[in-house]
Amino acid sequence: MEERRSRMGLNSPTSKVAYAGGTVTGAAGTSILDPATGRPVGASDPYFLEVNHELSDKGFFVAAADDLITWARTGSLMWMTFGLACCAVEMMQVSMPRYDVERFGFAPRASPRQSDVMIVAGTLTNKMAPALRKVYDQMPEPRYVISMGSCANGGGYYHYSYSVVRGCDRIVPVDIYVPGCPPTAEALLYGILLLQKKIRRVGTIER
């Protein structure tokens, strides 16, 4: 096995590993290069350019506490799984290696008291509605809700059923709606990124 790895060049401390988004260089993948420019990903981002300028000029930079807290929160969102139907399959898929939502700082938690986001995935029935509200009330502030799929958004296929809530927004306030029946894992991932964008725009200290 070691001989095979040596022939492939994987034992070299400066080996390069190619992947869809660019090239990882170094023993532990110290930098991710953009194949179009050859520079590290995000090097031309105005935010990082300003930070680099401040650090090179003063050795430190001054930022508002709200901006710092918002930055930390968007990179450490813990989500509470609330799978109610087939949408939960796609919700689980977004955590698998193909999408790996944890690389965006979005990790699952089994307790509502440790969660920032609730993903309502599937059909919400009248009997389940009090449990949904109870779990939501146990989440610490600020808390967010992603409504995933047509059934959670508005009842979906069971809209006219006597036993189904016509949208989970009748029970809890919803921040992001992800359409589809069921939505793909890519759609949910896009909704998560939109939630992070909303948090950066609105802030987290007062809500």
Swiss-Prot record:
PANTHER family: NADH DEHYDROGENASE (PTHR11995), NADH DEHYDROGENASE [UBIQUINONE] IRON-SULFUR PROTEIN 7, MITOCHONDRIAL (PTHR11995:SF14). The gene is nuoB. Gene3D superfamilies: 3.40.50.12280. It holds the Pfam family Oxidored_q6. It comes from Nitrobacter winogradskyi (strain ATCC 25391 / DSM 10237 / CIP 104748 / NCIMB 11846 / Nb-255). Its EC number is 7.1.1.-. NDH-1 is composed of 14 different subunits. Subunits NuoB, C, D, E, F, and G constitute the peripheral sector of the complex. Belongs to the complex I 20 kDa subunit family. Binds 1 [4Fe-4S] cluster. [4Fe-4S] cluster binds at residues 86-87, 151, 181. It is found in: Cell inner membrane. InterPro entries: NADH_UbQ_OxRdtase-like_20kDa (IPR006137), NADH_UQ_OxRdtase_20Kd_su (IPR006138). Its cofactor is [4Fe-4S] cluster. Its main location: membrane. This is NADH-quinone oxidoreductase subunit B. One of its GO terms (biological process) is electron transport coupled proton transport. The keyword Lipid biosynthesis does not apply. It catalyses: a quinone + NADH + 5 H(+)(in) = a quinol + NAD(+) + 4 H(+)(out). Transmembrane segments: none annotated. Keywords: 4Fe-4S, Cell inner membrane, Cell membrane, Iron, Iron-sulfur, Membrane, Metal-binding, NAD, Quinone, Translocase, Transport, Ubiquinone. It is a peripheral membrane protein. It comes from the Bacteria. GO terms for cellular component: plasma membrane; respiratory chain complex I. NDH-1 shuttles electrons from NADH, via FMN and iron-sulfur (Fe-S) centers, to quinones in the respiratory chain. The immediate electron acceptor for the enzyme in this species is believed to be ubiquinone. Couples the redox reaction to proton translocation (for every two electrons transferred, four hydrogen ions are translocated across the cytoplasmic membrane), and thus conserves the redox energy in a proton gradient. The keyword NADP does not apply. One of its GO terms (molecular function) is NADH dehydrogenase (ubiquinone) activity. PROSITE patterns: COMPLEX1_20K.
